[in-house]
Amino acid sequence: MLNPYEIMETIRMIEEEKLDIRTITMGISLRDCAHPSGEVARKNIYDKILRYAGNLVEVARDIELEYGIPIINKRIAVTPISLVAESSSEEDFIKFAETLDKAAGEVGVDFIGGFSALVHKGFTTGDKKLINSIPRALANTERVCSSINVATTRAGINMEAVSRMGKIIKKTARETRDKGGLGCAKLVVFANVPEDNPFMAGAFHGIGEPECVINVGISGPGAVKAALKKVKGQKFDTVAETIKKTAFKITRAGQLVAREASKRLNVPFGIVDLSLAPTPAVGDSVAEILEEMGLESCGAPGTTAALALLNDAVKKGGTMASSHVGGLSGAFIPVSEDAGMIKAVKRGSLNLEKLEAMTCVCSVGLDMIAVPGSTKADTISAVIADEVAIGVINNKTTAVRIIPVPGKDVGDEVEFGGLLGTAPVMDVSKFSSSAFIGRGGRIPAPIHSLKN
């Protein structure tokens, strides 16, 4: 039973510690929109998105006002467009991306995800068309996000896809060079991608999902940091217990919003994603939580252990607070979106190699990392290969969202604005991986993938 102290504590978390609901994401199946005529398929897509999501933003605002819990983003995730558009005879899928963008603008959401393909074992014709369309699709749209799954623990790593995505990322940066390569901030390459992720840029509506669903992503690094301030100097047992209790309260807020949105929109509730999602705002940082545990600067020795503790404790506390947990559900470490991470990079305590180590124990992977515009496509592909290998071997989701910023070099900065923040350009190894990436083929699945 709730007591008055807990109610006041939750109010304080919202007012002073930047607790919010990061996103309400509506997943919509577009499988029945496929048609041999691209024009008909696009009309079907547009009409269906408006039919289901027409009231999403209004309902989210009503809940926000009624309960006093800020809901930062309203988003849509759709069936991977490579599946929906494949039956059309069109040579590229750019117009499909523009249709998604138009529909998203009409209903008023911040982003729409699902310009996606699943190619962990190989490419279909539709997959190839979609991947080749990504650079111009992201350059021509404002709200569309793209994701490609190149590996799974059960299938291994499709190195042909890894190689191709390095080139696509470079081309996307060139196509959006007037905005600092912004298109790459809306493009993510996955291993073991979840089908119910509410966060961008990796959200899409999986083929095992219902016709329509509501998924919610929480936030609240500031609330966790504030709680840890009260146990300064105490043992890690106490630290873990404190994070668990705070995560429970944060997730309860997410569960409340998800259930209420589901009821008002007459759409099934899917999952709450337990990921601690930072913002560029001061005091809303995952890096600062790690430093509160006793690290001088994020990236110092001990950072990976601190992050492992945080990630595990958030899951334990959050799982108790929601009937259905899913998505990515862990701590995010996006460099440009976390004020503490940005400071750590500038201080020199955090580099690409340390971030890769940290991704072994947390959610997602190398996220929102800016590198010099001169970085070769093969090097980007090799970074992707390293990161997805961590996911495949450890049976977890990993991903890469990397921005080779045109015209920028190590030490420069690029400003993306809003939740995407500011990215310091980080150093990448100058040694070549071209011969390695040039081999192609597939890296086989690990032996422990054979579970049956």
UniProtKB/Swiss-Prot annotation:
It comes from the Bacteria. InterPro entries: UPF0210 (IPR007841). Homodimer. Belongs to the UPF0210 family. Transmembrane segments: none annotated. CDD domains: RNR_PFL_like_DUF711. This is UPF0210 protein Hore_14430. It comes from Halothermothrix orenii (strain H 168 / OCM 544 / DSM 9562). PANTHER family: UPF0210 PROTEIN MJ1665 (PTHR37560:SF1), UPF0210 PROTEIN SPR0218 (PTHR37560). NCBIfam families: PRK05313.1. Pfam families: DUF711.
